[in-house]
Amino acid sequence: MTLQRTDEVLTFTKEHYIDKTQELKKGIETFPSIFIEGAAESGKTVAVNMLMKEQKDTDFVLFLMDREKDDGSFIRKLSLIRRRMEKEKIWVVCENMNQPLSDAKAEALVEFVKRLADGNRCIFVSREKPHRKILELLWKEKMHLISQKSLLFSIEEIESICKRNSLAVRAKDIFRETGGWPGCVCLLARMFRNKMEAGESATLSEMRNSYEVAGYIDSEILGTLSKRESDFLEIGSWCPWINGKMCEDIWKISDGMETIKNLERKGFLIECGKEQYATAALFRKEACRQNSKRKFWMTVGAWYEAEGFIKEGLFCMTNANEKEALKTFAIRNYAEIPFIDMGFVAAERWKETIPEICFLRGMNCYFSQNIEGMDK
């Protein structure tokens, strides 16, 4: 626990950042506490720092919750702060609430917030969703929940960063690469500006795939995930999409949907269709820790086909690089494949004269406007 004045808050570089305190202000002005939930490097702490910079007559107490191991000691500290609040205006910030919170700590924090008055406030900052007991504050209108989505930068906000720094890169391209993830946007902006000042040039793709940016994503963001979350994210990077049924049918994981929803909540997975989730573009490269195997593609492809998702099945069977398996898949689904892949060139190499393959060859010639080939 540390006591700091507002002028001692960590600094931030305004040239490369956007003020995202509006949502925090809305909550903190109405409720005695706010809970900011977001993955690593999503801008949670910077937003809190920017908010605290504006509180000129307020002291704040910072708890690094991952270091508060003893329940009794933590509860005694809260009691001490409560007594001080009778004479002083203090805001309590509970940072790094990333590990499971004990019931005792959660109950103590709930009671602490319920008794806040006279402008005293409590701010929770976490990579994980609130402890169930903490939710009582939300239900009883004692807490405002701030999601990660409200912290992400929009194309317009990225455009303002680009203009502020005279960056010769389009904001929508940065947004496409980063999804508006604040830490990544700011890092790219700084690196582009450094290149510009040094008289050097680089493309967005080169900067995104640079050692510095790739290492940042892998270490500072993906490195905070559990092994299970990392595994799900990797599968979501290889596959067109994943869902809970796939996890249960193929890998016998009955609670896979819970992990998927948590990853979506953190911004690592995006919902690309009804109950279909894929890894966000920002993380696809680093999330793939090893090359996918033939067996993986065959298994997943068979699942997609059995569920009626022929386009996804074709993608997997093509990646399996198993010619005979692809051919039998195409024969089973000959009526749909030409309209999924109008340039299904694999059919050109098949010499069989069975109706299904003849149809596939003919449709390939039709879509490629090879009229002569249709007679073969």
What are these regions (language model features)?
Residues 1-26:
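Conserved adenine-nucleotide phosphate-binding loops and their immediately adjacent elements
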Residues 41, 48, 145, 160-212, ...:
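Amphipathic alpha-helical "lid/sensor" segments that cap RecA-like P-loop NTPase cores
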Residues 46, 108-173, 177, 183-188, ...:
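Alpha-helical sensor/transducer elements of the RecA-like P-loop NTPase core
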Residues 56-69:
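Conserved catalytic segments around the Walker B and adjacent sensor/switch elements
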Residues 83-109:
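Conserved P-loop NTPase "ATPase switch" module shared by AAA+ and STAND
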Residues 194, 209-214, 238-246, 250-302:
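Short capping/hinge segments at domain boundaries that bridge a core fold to an adjacent linker or tail
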Residues 293-374:
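Extended alpha-helical scaffolding segments used for macromolecular assembly and cargo binding
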